[in-house]
Design a protein with these regions (language model features):
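N-terminal intrinsically disordered/low-complexity leader segments
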Residues: 1-24, 157-158, 208-229
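Amphipathic alpha-helical packing segments from all-alpha helical-bundle domains
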Residues: 129-154, 164-176, 191-194, 198-202
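Hydrophobic alpha-helical connector segments
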Residues: 73, 87-116, 170, 193
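Alpha-helical DNA-contacting segments of helix-turn-helix folds
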Residues: 37, 64, 71-78, 121, ...
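Helix-turn-helix
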Residues: 28, 39-69, 73
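Generic hydrophobic, amphipathic alpha-helix propensity
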Residues: 24-33, 49, 74-78, 82, ...
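Short secondary-structure transition hinges
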Residues: 102, 109-147, 157-158, 183
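Secondary-structure edge/capping motif, primarily at the C-terminal ends of alpha-helices
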Residues: 86-93, 121-125, 177-185
Length: 229
């Protein structure tokens, strides 16, 4: 059989059976990436990940663009579960300090359960031109926590201007504390969460936060997010 006849019959370069579903294939690649990160560590290379998946690097690049794109895809997967879990701490009938503790504890639980993946996501994998707050995991958390703080400041009748600044400052505190704890686990998770809560809540009360809620105070649109008021 000639090459031309094989092409006409559609047998060149295609395995038998139906073509793989693109989304299913993408999820399989993400699973392989997570296995490689957990095995090698947060500095796992695209070559490590391709080897784990049994593929060549060009296939990874075709699906994710580059390592930053892969990190963004992994962050998107975790955000789907982690962000709602953290924000749910503010939907209870507990006092605001307990809400803050619950949110911090939920995040630290993720760090404790998957430390290598956590470090992969926050260690500048976004590329040299991407700032800390522009990384997918950090940026989304920062904006949503800012909404919570803005509602609390508005309820207290004080300036809501610093809400986003304070949100990212809180994130920096918790992320740095988590990083320190991974490297130097000299205290229990409960103690770590208690100390972080004391530090964060002390700053919030000094700033006038009276109540906390994951929802904007006025309807579904947080006007202050664009005006800065």
């Amino acid at each position: 059989m000639t090459l031309a006849s094989r092409r006409r019959r559609g047998r060149v370069g295609r395995p038998p059976g139906p073509a793989p579903d693109p989304e299913q294939r993408r999820q399989e690649l993400l699973e392989a990436a997570l296995r490689a990160i957990r095995r090698v560590g947060p500095n796992a290379s695209m070559e490590d990940i391709a080897g784990e998946a049994g593929l060549t690097k060009p296939i990874l690049y075709a699906n994710f663009g580059d390592k930053a794109g892969l990190a963004a895809a992994i962050a998107e997967r975790y955000l789907g579960d982690l962000l709602p879990a953290v924000l749910s701490a503010f939907e209870t009938d507990a006092d605001p300090r307990t809400m803050v503790r619950g949110a911090i504890d939920t995040f630290i639980g993720f760090v404790e359960g998957d430390p290598k993946v956590y470090r992969f996501l926050v260690r500048g994998v976004g590329g040299a031109d991407m700032s800390f707050i522009e990384q997918r995991l950090i940026g989304e958390f920062g904006l949503r926590i800012a909404q919570v703080l803005r509602t609390g400041l508005r309820a207290a009748g004080v300036d809501t201007g610093p809400a986003e600044l304070w949100s990212f400052a809180i994130l920096g505190t918790v992320l740095s504390g988590a990083e320190w704890w991974i490297v130097r686990p000299t205290m229990s998770r409960a103690d770590l969460v208690d100390y972080l809560t004391a530090f964060v809540w002390g700053g919030l009360t000094a700033g006038g936060v009276a109540t906390l809620s994951p929802r904007p105070a006025f309807g579904g649109q947080d006007a202050d997010a664009t005006t800065g008021n």
